[in-house]
């Protein structure tokens, strides 16, 4: 569940949720993503606008909700008990039921088929995909569940939150398509916003804090609280591996600051074996906390078949969270666009975050003989190389 203070932020995912709610599909929608990316707030906002009756059940905060499902004998019994629990009348055809934090009651995901088949109400589910619950959610009944993954706000969402209009974006797209120079004033404004984005990032709570206070210290406090929450999740959801998970998580900023930005297993432990701790890396990725980016033997199609699973970079899900882990002076240096400091890690993290938010699988290419490409992606049947320059190069 997320703070409702970010309810006025425009999110790209809102349109996808609207399409689902306006359709006559006999499916439920599962909205996934890391904690604090804005899932709960957006679903609540869109659901209350689209349906006269909006019923919300949080399996993390409400232990009675978990017991309700576990003791129900069938879908009709569940709906009867749900109506009693929430104290509201469930009106057929006019009620949206929002089941939040479903990782706490993962059986509800596989049972959604029967609730959908019952046909009286519409359903949206949300969860953070933490730990082993991921495989259960992904094995949900085919044909009864659509999945929408949410990410932190991308640069366009951030710019719109800061007042950039459609006209400006139309100008930028037109210049890109026609390979023309962007208006100098527009360019300056967008670069200022981009540098600000590198500090604030895309976590809705951090963005809302900046828009309200325009105080980067307060933004950093919000970011630190999110990082602390992630560490608590690590300890809670995988107690056996929590020490390794914490070490991996804490090492991400320094590993990205190294020359090749690759995650070096020996930096964790001299005898560290990937096979032994593969689940720890997988957990961070599945939780949406980290973005693994794999080296490919050759930058050729299909990239997935060229992937080297033992060679990878590990980015944080949000560039603002990464910036918050570095020394305080980096914020001012980023804002000023100083060129004598290497911001490569921050710029690459922003690029990884943007690519992931737009559905691209993340790869890079590094060969002693042929050189290095920061990212390689598949786009419309082609492999595109991406080189990220922070300004110092």
Q: What would you call each of these model-derived segments?
A:
Residues 1-20:
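N-terminal pre-Walker A segment at the start of P-loop NTPase domains
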Residues 122-128, 149:
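Structural recognition of the conserved hydrophobic beta-strand(s) that form the central parallel beta-sheet
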Residues 39:
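Conserved lysine of the Walker
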Residues 61-92:
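Short glycine-rich substrate-engagement loop in P-loop NTPases that contacts/grips substrate
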Residues 31:
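Hydrophobic anchor at the beta1->P-loop junction of P-loop NTPases
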Residues 208-382:
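Accessory nucleic acid-recognition modules appended to NTPase machines
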Residues 134-258:
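Interdomain motor-coupling "hinge/lid" segment immediately C-terminal to the ATP-binding subdomain
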């Amino acid at each position: 569940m997320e703070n409702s203070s970010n309810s006025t932020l425009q999110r790209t995912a809102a349109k996808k949720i609207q399409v689902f709610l306006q359709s006559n599909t006999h499916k439920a929608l599962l909205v996934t993503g890391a904690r604090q990316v804005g899932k709960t707030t957006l679903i609540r906002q869109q659901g209350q606008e689209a349906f006269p009756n909006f019923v919300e059940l949080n399996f993390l905060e409400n232990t009675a909700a978990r017991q309700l499902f576990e003791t129900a004998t069938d879908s009709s019994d569940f709906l009867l008990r749900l109506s009693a629990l929430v104290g509201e009348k469930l009106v057929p055809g006019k009620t949206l039921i929002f089941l939040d934090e479903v990782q706490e009651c993962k059986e509800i995901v596989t049972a959604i088929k029967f609730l959908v088949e019952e046909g009286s109400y519409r359903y949206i589910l949300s969860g953070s995909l933490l730990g082993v619950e991921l495989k259960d959610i992904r094995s949900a009944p085919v044909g009864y569940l659509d999945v929408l993954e949410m990410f932190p706000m991308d640069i366009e969402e951030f710019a719109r939150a800061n007042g950039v209009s459609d006209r400006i974006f139309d100008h930028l797209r037109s210049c890109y398509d026609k390979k023309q120079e962007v208006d100098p004033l527009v360019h300056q404004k967008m670069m200022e916003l981009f540098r600000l984005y590198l500090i604030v990032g895309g976590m809705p709570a951090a963005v809302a804090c900046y828009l309200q206070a325009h105080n980067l210290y307060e933004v950093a406090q919000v970011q630190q609280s999110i990082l602390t929450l992630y560490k608590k999740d690590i300890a809670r959801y995988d107690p056996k591996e929590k020490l390794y998970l914490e070490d991996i998580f804490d090492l991400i900023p320094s590993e990205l600051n190294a020359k090749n930005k690759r995650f070096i297993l020996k930096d964790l432990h001299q005898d560290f074996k990937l096979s032994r701790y593969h689940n720890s890396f997988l957990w961070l990725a599945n939780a949406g906390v980290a973005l693994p980016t794999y080296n490919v033997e050759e930058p050729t199609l299909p990239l997935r078949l060229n992937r080297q699973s033992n060679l990878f970079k590990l980015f944080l899900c949000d560039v603002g969270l990464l910036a918050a882990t570095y020394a305080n002076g980096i914020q001012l240096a980023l804002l000023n666009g100083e060129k004598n400091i290497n911001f490569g890690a921050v710029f690459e993290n922003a690029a990884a975050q943007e690519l992931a938010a737009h559905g691209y699988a993340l790869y890079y290419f590094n060969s002693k003989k042929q050189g290095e490409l920061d990212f390689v992606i598949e786009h419309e049947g082609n492999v595109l190389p991406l080189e990220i320059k922070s300004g110092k190069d």
